[in-house]
Structure formats: C-alpha cells, structure tokens
Amino acid sequence: MQQLTSQALEQMINPKTQTSILVIGGAEDKIHGREILQTFFSRAGGENAQLAIIPSASREPSIQGERYQKIFENMGAKTLKVFDIRERHHCEDPQWHDYLEDCTGVFMTGGDQLRLYSLLADTPLMEKIRVAARAGKIALAGTSAGAAVMSHHMIAGGVVGNLLIDR
C-alpha cells in the first residue's frame, strides 16, 4: 500500500521541481559559492526554471530585485520576473497571477518583515503561492524577512529588555 501512496505523490509533484521550502536566516553568500541560492535555483528547475523574485521587504526593492535577478541569470535562469509590489493593490495585478501559473520557484528577499507581511498577507497572490508550495508545484525560498513571513507566527518587533542571569 505504501508503494501506491508513493506513486500517487510522485504524480502530484511537478517534475520540473524538487519540492522545497528553504527558510534562509539571512546574509546568504551572494558572491562566492552561493550554495544556498544555487540549491534553490536547482530545486526550482535549474536552467528550465521560471522564477519569481519578490523584493518587497526591501527599502530599495528595485535594487534588491535587480541584484537577485543578476545572480539567478548568472546561474543560467532564462525565465525570471521581479514582482515589484509596493502597495497591497499591486498583488491584484493579473500579470503576477498569470506568471505564477507556470512558475517553478518563488524567492522572497530580506528587509522589513512587517512591510512584507503588510503587503502580501491574506492576498490572493500569496494564497496562490502558498497553494503552489503545498502542492509541490514550486520551490519556495525566503531570506531574512522573506523567511520570517513563512512561519505561522512571526516576530515583528520588540525592545531589548533586561537580561535575566541565573546566579
């Protein structure tokens, strides 16, 4: 019976991707080995990947989006779009929804997780990404703020309090 379950799962998984959710702590290597970025790229389909980059957490989304676009293009990406979402209503843009239909990888950059959350949370666009990730249709990665918004509970701020030391 387990073999049938395994075969059923294999049929559901997009053959272009290795289903993955990569939660990257931040400060990933963007210059030398780029190992974690290369892992995402490979799991999203490598040169056959169709990637979406969401730099909305950044104060400078154009610069951040362009940086990751160049990185993935240098790895061999041929089909790639930067989702320039700066207002919640931008999530309703049909071009993003249409592009996600054949997307094999979504990468969310670092920055301010509260900004990213306020732009994407509970939008049809984010729901489409979530459903695709759950169904194994895309590799989903986020670094720093992009990683923080993937969890059910997210730390959005705080203050440094007194440190308790057990003596």
What would you call each of these model-derived segments?
Residues 2-115:
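Extended, subdomain-level signal for the structured scaffold at the beginning of enzyme domains
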Residues 18, 109, 115-167:
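Class I SAM-dependent methyltransferase SAM-binding "motif I" and its flanking Rossmann-like core
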